[in-house]
Regions:
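Structural motif
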Residues: 89-92, 120, 155, 187-190, ...
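Short beta-strand segments
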Residues: 94-96, 157-159, 190-193, 212-214, ...
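Acidic/histidine-rich catalytic neighborhood of metal-dependent amide-processing enzymes
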Residues: 129-203
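Active-site metal-coordination/substrate-binding segment of hydrolases
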Residues: 87-158
Length: 434
């Protein structure tokens, strides 16, 4: 018998594209943006099952297929190719069957149907993450067909509900809670939902915040009688940012992990109730996010941001003003401008274990197949994987779509990249036999 890599061979490109065409055809129905758009991952899962069920134990094949749903139409699939040694295992997880939304009017092609332009495979989900669903399905199909004798059990976990966290208990969080992934802790877990063919070794945490500013509305010809909420908001945001960067500077470990940026705190949205050009606004809301490298604690940052706001409120007269009649206190009216801060659900970043066997085999496989290895880190966030890490899983992350098209209009991936991803997977399986 040849080597594992010889047996598993190359990606069957025709079969991959055929399956991808079917799952991209469902992408309109797996957009995830509740309450308007609740994905029906069952539609994608059915196409995966159509490929793998003939090779399952119920049909006399080697694959153990477990279809798990915690809500109607919200499917997860756990597919297992058993090895010969108890406790020896590796897994490919995170291939999610939902997608972010797409507006066909903004695209150069139909986002909800696969179109092929040479090496380019175009459509919503090609990079994130239906392309990976189809890719890992082909890997498990090849294992089921060729039946190599492996020491390690190989498990693939296709999940629901990755793109939105407003509805919980549907996807990988529920699988972990119910113990269905416990045995995956005995070996490396490869989360297949990043891009650019290199190991992603660090991701950022995210804290969405809103600062509501209250001043006093008045005629713009009498600015001394107003508290300008816009000016107060600008100066307060600047002060909060200055304090944040003092307390959470670039961390020494960020260089080791290759983070492109340190932690950041910035506004991204601004709103106010409206009014005439001759009215000084009495309130406004500034919203934004903190992107936090994984070497800082999310709860520590939230506590600090609240402290900044409390201190600014207590000392609001010390805040910089804008011009001779700009002020944030009206003593004669016993009025003070004020701020309040609130947070939406925060997520923590991840720093992968660079000493683990999983990381080393991923790097070696990448170098062999792609020709070089250059791990990277971003302060973009990958939900769910920090929780897996805290539960005791050795999580490593990789992906074979394109970062440039991630969540973007005119999303596409390259067939040649996906074919290399398949070879990386077979190299990982082969190395872990030693």
């Amino acid at each position: 018998m040849g080597s594992v890599e010889d047996i598993l061979g190359e990606l069957n490109r025709d079969a991959f594209v055929s399956l991808l065409q079917k799952v991209i055809g469902e992408s309109e129905h797996v957009q995830n943006n509740p309450p308007e758009l609740i994905p029906q991952e069952l539609l994608v899962a059915n196409h995966v099952l159509e490929v793998l069920r003939p090779l399952s134990t119920e049909c006399g094949g080697p694959l153990i297929v477990n279809h798990v749903s915690y809500s109607p139409g919200r499917s997860n699939l756990i597919v297992e190719y058993p090895g010969t040694e108890s406790g020896k295992i590796l897994s490919f997880v995170g291939m999610h069957m939902d997608v972010v939304t797409a507006n066909p009017a903004d695209w150069e092609f139909n986002p909800f149907a696969l179109s092929i332009d040479g090496d380019k495979l175009c459509g919503r989900g090609t990079t994130d993450c239906l392309g990976h669903v189809a890719l890992v399905t082909q890997l498990m199909k090849k294992l089921g067909e060729t039946k190599p004798k492996l020491k390690s059990t190989v498990v693939a976990v296709f999940i629901a509900s990755e793109e939105n966290s407003s509805i919980t208990g549907i996807g990988v969080d529920a699988l972990v809670k119910n113990g269905l992934l416990d045995k995956l802790k005995n070996g490396p877990l490869f989360w297949i939902d990043t891009a650019d063919k290199q190991p992603c070794i660090g991701t950022g945490g995210m804290i969405p915040w809103k600062v509501h500013v209250t001043g006093k509305l008045f005629h713009s010809g009498l600015p001394h009688k107003a508290i300008n909420a816009l000016e107060l908001g600008m100066e307060a945001t600047k002060e909060i940012q200055l304090r944040f960067y003092k307390d959470f500077p670039a961390h020494p470990k960020e260089k080791d992990y290759g983070f492109a940026t340190p932690s950041t705190m910035k506004p991204t949205q601004w709103s106010y109730p409206g009014g005439g050009i001759n009215q000084i606004p009495g309130e406004c809301t500034i919203a934004g996010d903190v992107r936090l490298t994984p070497f800082y604690n999310v709860s520590d940052v939230m506590k600090k941001l609240q402290e900044y706001v409390d201190d600014i409120n207590q000392n609001i007269e010390k805040l910089d003003t804008r011009g001779p009649v700009s002020h944030y206190v009206l003593p004669d009216e016993n009025l003070r401008g004020r701020l309040s801060i609130s947070f939406e659900e925060a997520t923590s970043g991840v720093a992968c274990n660079l000493d683990s066997r999983g990381f080393h085999v991923l790097c070696k496989a990448t170098e062999k197949v792609v020709g070089y290895v250059k791990p990277y880190s971003i302060t973009g966030s990958l939900p769910l994987i920090r929780e897996l890490q805290e539960e005791g899983f050795d999580v490593q992350t990789a992906g074979y779509g394109l970062m440039a098209t991630y969540h973007a209009k005119n999303e596409y991936c390259l067939l040649s990249d996906m074919a290399q991803g398949y070879k990386v997977f077979t190299s990982i399986i082969s190395q872990l036999e030693d």
